[in-house]
Amino acid sequence: MAGLQEPRRVTELSNELTRDIDTADPLGIVRRLCGSDAQLFAGWGGHPGVNDPVILDRLWKLSLKTAALLKENQDQKKNNRIVFSGCGTSGRIAWLCSWTYNRILQKFGHTPCFHYLIAGGDRSLIISNELPEDDPPKGAEDLKKVAEGADHVMFVGITCGLSAPYVAGQIDHSMHQPNMTSVLMGFNPVSLSRNAPIEKWDKTCRQVFLELETLSCTSDSAFIINPIVGPEPITGSSRMKGGSTTAVLLGTVFLTSLQTLLGQPILPSMTLPAREPEETEVVFDHSLSPSLSPMVSLLDCYSQTYQTVYRHSGGVASLLKLAASCICQPSGRLIYLGADTLGALGLVDASEMVPTYGVGLEEFRGFVAGGWEGCGNTEGDLSGYGKTFRVSLSQFESDVLPSLTDQDCVLCLHGSSQRTGPPHLHTIVNKVLASPAKCGLLVMAENGMSCNHLLDKRYETAVLIRLPYYHAFGKECVFAGFALKLVLNAISTGANILKGRVYGNEMINLRLSNDKLFERAIAIIEKWSGANEEDAKFALLRAIYKQDDAANFQYRPISSHITEASSQNMVVPLALLLAGGRSSVSYSSREKAAPVCQRSQGCHINGDRPNPWPLGHYIPIYLTTTRPNTLSL
């Protein structure tokens, strides 16, 4: 009943700054994303943001706790571990951050102690594995395995919407263990965390997270880090602002802890804290505490990196335009090539397209020099799982390079500190430049570094972003990586908008890969068809099972629906047609329909704003012709 529905979580709301993003040209898309990303630092709606004194106090206390655990490893030879965990994007950020922090420890002669977990294991770094995300006991089991033999474990569970059952199971386990510190990171008030029943479990996310919140008031082994940074620019797409905020918060806490341990500044200009506050001291105003200055300075570095990226909005828009000119083609592809952390970020961005926009596995790809070797992932080389997991440059050369056409866009990702990059990358790039593919260059440049060696007139578009900050501890490209994430998110999101996979700021062809996305699909159908919740769900089931009479499927567990739907494309658009009054639809021919959202019809890449026509009460329609009055599946 609509009157009894709870308020929607902030992370599931529509961002008012981007509600017309589907009508924008490439530069307009980037400018709207700039406004949304500003909320990461400015906060949203009167809630505490990342710069709020209450959040800063929690971050500082967590940093002190972390530094103490790291110090015990150094001085007392203890086996303390720090474990980051999450589903989808959160798990991928957990992987990248643990890899980065371990390399910093190794550089200074310390034993790595950072670990990560991702629901579904390492295969989920490339392809979402739906059912483990909704399995709390599996989450607890995975945590027990990684904690085995440790003296103390700091567990950091990341769930942007406070909605992941996998993480809830881990928090439920960790907060009842005497040798564990429990940290929950997300971007909703705890009171709005997900409260839906979970299959084969007797608790909800909200029950677990409220218990942790209560515990955090009295214990130094429980933390909740939940600044409110506003709705995503594409509704519910936590890979964007949620993922970026996660990277900022993890960096702020754990780089500061490493600075304390190592006695080395994160940046040459950053001083060490003058003192540590007493255990009983509570700091609510960072301007009064010299101890907080390195952490505040670090947040300022991230903020300045964000500002620098969007001062290059024109360049980012030019790369977006280049990518969209290929993605909007029938067989177009966008391919990222890079090395080290920057290459891995291309891998991550490409991996997020299937669940978010329902694209094919080959439409967005990422390749990194050296492949899985040296990527710091737990399971090592994943190439044996299939073509999609073959991510080295050698595998690009054998699998993809021979098939490149003028409908493909290859984007080369460089850091200026890499000089010419790995020799193989230079060789591969030259071969790509000689191919029919459209080739772009994106350079994250370190101040004072010449980039002339990277430039080549054969690139159709080349963009250089010179950053005020680049490395952390003189080695890891933390700030360059944050900048690159913002740019890649803009490029891939913009390309999908121009392809017609977004209406307003809603992703209308999401892949139903977990419980949360199943719920989101029902909400989208309700919103755009005018149907009530019950009818919207029934239309969704009809679309999943391809039967007009879906009554037999109504009482199956949601996991059954997800298993059936996770490999299907265009389920939500089909359900929209059904919920909107289309009583007769040819299910067998639905795969032939080309995704075109009416308001972005014609793929306005060159800056021509389309003229939206009145669309009636149901909006996103999959057309087989260009005539607005033709609905055909």
Give the label of every model feature segment.
Residues 1-633:
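Conserved N-terminal alpha-helical segment that immediately precedes and caps sugar-phosphate-binding
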